[in-house]
Amino acid sequence: MASGPIAGGGVSKTKHKWSDSGNKSQKRSKPTVANSNSLGLEDNHQMMKISLSSISKLEVRNLKRKLQAELEEVRSLIKRLEPQGNNFAPVPNKKLKTANGGKKGGVHGAAADKGTVQILKSCNNLLTKLMKHKSGWIFNTPVDVVTLGLHDYHNIIKEPMDLGTVKTRLSKSLYKSPLEFAEDVRLTFNNAMLYNPVGHDVYHMAEILLNLFEEKWVPLETQYELLIRKQQPVRDIDFHAPVSTNTHNVEALPLPAPTPSLSPPPPPKVVENRTLERAESMTNPVKPAVLPVVPEKLVEEASANRDLTFDEKRQLSEDLQDLPYDKLEAVVQIIKKRTPELSQQDDEIELDIDSLDLETLWELFRFVTEYKESLSKKKEEQGLDSERDAESFHNSVHESNTLVTGLESSKVTELGHVASTVRQEVNVGGSSSSNSSSSGSGSGSSGSDSDSSGHESDTGN
């Protein structure tokens, strides 16, 4: 078999030929070296050639050890040359679905999730309200410097911006985050306030819209910050082994001493310690981490930017129909406030819930909710008042009954005393009359005796 170079080692094997007598040849030749200094580093790619058939087994083992040592040196040198942290295999790139349905230039990073897409939709709604405002028409298009004769405009304003440009960028998903959208909106109004003096109509209009934007931007910014906080732990995942932070209950167990194969199980002290630790963990539960408290008002405003469901709209329509006449005027004013064209019509307005914008719907929803809460509070107060009246009436009746009972008992007591007195008097009178009657009868008997004696005397004579 012909010999050839082997990649990485430069060693080739040749099959030893047997002699005609069947005995293995005892002749051994020294290894042939083409060029000891080349080692494949020169341009002609000359490599070391070693005939394994011509060297002994001991020399083969030594050569193998030498090559392995050189290979380890090469590997260690490669590790030193490579930057730290790049020793992992490259992760294959996966195509991420963009937020705008696969179009190029879409929102990436944190905006790829549904939460950020929903916030950007709310930003689009806010931008539409600014552009439809009665003072927003002047900011909807770029400033026409030539037509207006503003020759010094670009000297003062270094970065022009308008709401129409913001609308275009938002529709093409050129904003990486809602914060960039807010910067361009602020830049539009700040440019107008910078170029126009204080007291100018444009300055006043820009100030009004900027204040309106800042007011409506607060819940969106809060919602975006909450979304970023939720995504932050996912980005900072540590792939190292988890380390327990509850170190006060962990005891270092000593290594078991070498014992015979028939050694008894570990002493029960460890079990007792584990039982005590479990009891302590039951009596002293771990307190959860305190999350940052978001103001309730901001959370309510952030939730108010969502669309109303079909059931909520239906319930709102029914509640509006149940409102009394004095509350309908406030409802009309709420609708006219954001729909100026309705103010020119008659007092009767045909209301279509689906035609109202989101902000008007939420304001009507809050108005109806507050009215229902106030109505329930009044009913509760009336119920408490009626209960208090009934209780006071019951107490007064109880007191009057107690008073009457006391009077009756006192009268009964007095009557008892009178009856007992009468009985005593009756008893005394009866005894005296009986005595007198008995004495009378005695006298009568004596009289009869005297009469009888007299009669006898007369008879004797």
From Swiss-Prot:
GO molecular function, one term: histone binding
Protein location: Plastid, Chloroplast
All copies of domain NET, residue ranges: 298-379
Keyword tags: Bromodomain, Chloroplast, Chromatin regulator, Plastid, Transcription, Transcription regulation, Transit peptide, Ubl conjugation
Location of the transit peptide in the chain: 1-51
UniProt KW Chloroplast keyword: yes
Pfam family, one: Bromodomain
Assembly description: Interacts with SIZ1 (via PHD domain).
The protein's name: Transcription factor GTE3, chloroplastic
